[in-house]
Amino acid sequence: MIVQTFSLDNLLNGDEEGVPDPLADYRKLSYRDQLEDLQRKHHDRERELVSQITDLLEDSLHLKPDPRIRHFLDDFTDAGEALLTHFDKEEQIVFPLMYIHLSYDSETIKEVDALTSEHREQEKKMDSLKSRMHLFETSDWNLLRELLEELFTDLSVHISKEDDITFPNYIDLVTRK
């Protein structure tokens, strides 16, 4: 059996040779449709995943207190709260500004840049959590591990869509006039 592996970053950026770009359809959308896609496909699902993961961790701690799991839950809660706040900022402030301002607006550009910086912080938090996935290697943790992996993968795709496609498309649109 031949197993072929791919770099998620290369795959998302269309750099894997012979592999179709999984974001090709997304790239074809207008930036406004991209914003709707981000909210509908990523924000909603990631909110749900954060809630499910938090509930599973809290339930497990009630059954069997473990300081390592408590520490992971605390860090996950901090990262989850930052993520949800970030989504609210995107949905309530930045995305509406991007809908309204079809010409250069320094405030909107500043907000987009701030979101990109927040993405770097969120990636650091997720990397820290990923580094502790060994805590969940036993079969007792299958569901939690699957949900965490889904969240990490979805966030990676989500951030790539925003930072590599949507935000640059928007900035290109408003600066070329």
Cite the ranges covered by each PLM segment:
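Small-residue-biased structural context
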Residues: 1-177
